[in-house]
Amino acid sequence: MIPSIKRNKYGNTKVIIEGVKFDSKLEAFLYKILKDNGMDFDFQVNIELVPKFRFQYENIRALNMRVDFLLRYNGREIYIDTKGFATSESKIKYKLLKNKFKAEPQVNIIWLKTQKEVNAYIGRLKEEKEEWKLL
């Protein structure tokens, strides 16, 4: 059972599993699946989307995005974000993230919105792994 801590304005319930704090039940669900399947991943990865710059006399801060998971799998980097509700800010950052990695075919960017999508995606990865073993 996942203990709840506090609900935020989007209805997410923050949870703690194994001493790790998650912003939502969906994020915690994916963490548990990745860990149970022994997958190599990093959690809460910060990515610079737009570097800091100077405009006239003003210093403009860098624009960053925190992606929930960076999964290293079959020679690829898979950035996974769990978000049940898409805000206008998250949509823009998602597009900037895709733009940042557009020339890197070994990079995948995935946005999972439900536990059903999480199960389906991890299932596809496991099937792909089995196919590679047969080759």
Report the location of each language-model feature:
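Electrostatic, structured charged patches in enzyme active sites and in nucleic-acid/phosphate-binding
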Residues: 1-135
